[in-house]
UniProtKB/Swiss-Prot annotation:
Phylogenetic placement of the source organism: Bacteria, Pseudomonadati, Pseudomonadota, Gammaproteobacteria, Pasteurellales
Binding-site positions, [4Fe-4S] cluster: 12, 96, 197
Residues that coordinate or bind dimethylallyl diphosphate: 41, 74, 124, 225-227, 269
Stored Pfam families: LYTB
PANTHER family the record matches: 4-HYDROXY-3-METHYLBUT-2-ENYL DIPHOSPHATE REDUCTASE
GO biological process, one term: terpenoid biosynthetic process
Binding residues annotated for (2E)-4-hydroxy-3-methylbut-2-enyl diphosphate, in chain numbering: 41, 74, 124, 167, 225-227, 269
Domain of life (superkingdom): Bacteria
Catalysed transformations (reactions): isopentenyl diphosphate + 2 oxidized [2Fe-2S]-[ferredoxin] + H2O = (2E)-4-hydroxy-3-methylbut-2-enyl diphosphate + 2 reduced [2Fe-2S]-[ferredoxin] + 2 H(+); dimethylallyl diphosphate + 2 oxidized [2Fe-2S]-[ferredoxin] + H2O = (2E)-4-hydroxy-3-methylbut-2-enyl diphosphate + 2 reduced [2Fe-2S]-[ferredoxin] + 2 H(+)
CC cofactor note: Binds 1 [4Fe-4S] cluster per subunit.
Role summary: Catalyzes the conversion of 1-hydroxy-2-methyl-2-(E)-butenyl 4-diphosphate (HMBPP) into a mixture of isopentenyl diphosphate (IPP) and dimethylallyl diphosphate (DMAPP). Acts in the terminal step of the DOXP/MEP pathway for isoprenoid precursor biosynthesis.
Protein's name according to its UniProt entry: 4-hydroxy-3-methylbut-2-enyl diphosphate reductase
Pathway(s) where this gene product acts: Isoprenoid biosynthesis; dimethylallyl diphosphate biosynthesis; dimethylallyl diphosphate from (2E)-4-hydroxy-3-methylbutenyl diphosphate: step 1/1; Isoprenoid biosynthesis; isopentenyl diphosphate biosynthesis via DXP pathway; isopentenyl diphosphate from 1-deoxy-D-xylulose 5-phosphate: step 6/6
Length: 314
């Protein structure tokens, strides 16, 4: 029995940046540092930051006035930003720059009075933050999760209409939704290419190749990680059994019955140390070989805020 590792896998530039922001803030200012929402959707990462003194909260009313707070990689609404300013909170913003790019698209649409349609998953923190960039009551922003939702849209005119997407969606599903939107609203405007980020795109492509050569695909990632879920779904759609796992403790040995090659990948918020712990555990269950699938190289780096960057250099 062999293991085939997907490439690329694991941390993306936005996740690296978000974790660095929390760690540097703790190093400079000391604990406690408050973080609104899980800074990235991975239990192992969050538990590690908690151990260093990070305090994770869901809303700003849990943060003392004047304290330091970090916004998660998923971004926040304008209302949250205004509340932080009103309460004199010191903010370090760990919003992924690629999410911020979508925020700016929504804010521009709001300012122009252009109706906006966001393709995304209801209730996901990124979607809540992105929807919260729109404040034009005369137009409006509407959420679409699937092709079926398009028929329910309360939008009759295609004039001054634009769409955006969450950054961590299924490429195939999103393409179907965009195609259906353009069929119903031929004049709808949108980004030149969808807003799905490079890391999501690369990891989904890697899983396609992985699934072709595996009888089982394990995706290392937490249950609340959107991009990790999409990886597991993609492998399943290709006819390969797939499991989303937090770590080796989640592996059921019966999954390995009749399997010759186990494909392993990791969501953009899952650290490589978890992948290696899964590999080591599988070796105790009969794996004898480990190889890497060739894939594209990622060189993207996002800088931390200037105040933290100066300290990092020192």
């Amino acid at each position: 029995m062999n293991i085939l590792l997907a490439n690329p896998r694991g941390f993306c530039a936005g996740v690296d940046r978000a974790i660095s922001i929390v760690e540097l803030a703790l190093e400079i200012h000391g604990a406690p540092i408050y973080v609104r929402h899980e800074v990235v959707h991975n239990r192992f990462v969050v538990d590690g930051l908690k151990a260093k003194g990070a305090v994770f909260v869901e809303e700003l009313d849990e943060v003392p006035d004047g304290a330091i707070v970090i916004f998660s990689a998923h971004g926040v609404s304008q209302e949250v930003r205004q509340e932080a300013k009103r309460r004199d909170l010191k903010v370090f913003d760990a919003t992924c720059p690629l999410v911020t790019k979508v925020h700016m698209q929504v804010a521009r649409a709001s300012k122009k009075g252009t109706k906006a349609i966001l393709i995304g998953h209801e209730g996901h923190p990124e979607v809540i933050g992105t929807m919260g960039q729109y404040d034009n009551q005369d137009a409006g922003i509407f959420l679409v999760e699937s092709v079926e939702d398009i028929a329910k849209l309360p939008v009759s005119s295609q004039d001054d209409l634009t769409f955006m997407t969450q950054t961590t969606l299924s490429i195939d599903d999103t393409s179907d939704v965009i195609e259906a939107l353009k069929e119903k609203y031929p004049a709808i405007q949108g980004p030149r290419k969808n807003d799905i980020c490079y890391a999501t795109t690369n990891r989904q492509q890697a899983v396609r190749e992985l699934a072709k050569q595996s009888q089982l695909v394990l995706v290392v990632g937490s249950k609340n990680s959107s991009n990790s879920n999409r990886l597991a779904e993609l492998a399943s759609r290709m006819g390969v059994p797939s499991k989303l796992i937090d770590g080796p403790q989640d592996i059921d040995p019966s999954w390995l019955d009749g399997v010759e090659t186990i494909g392993i990948t990791a969501g953009a918020s899952a650290p490589e140390v978890l992948v290696q712990s899964v590999v080591e555990h599988l070796k105790t269950l009969g794996v004898t070989g480990v190889s890497n699938l060739e894939g594209c190289e990622e060189n993207m780096v996002f800088e931390v805020p200037k105040e933290l960057r100066i300290h990092e250099v020192k």
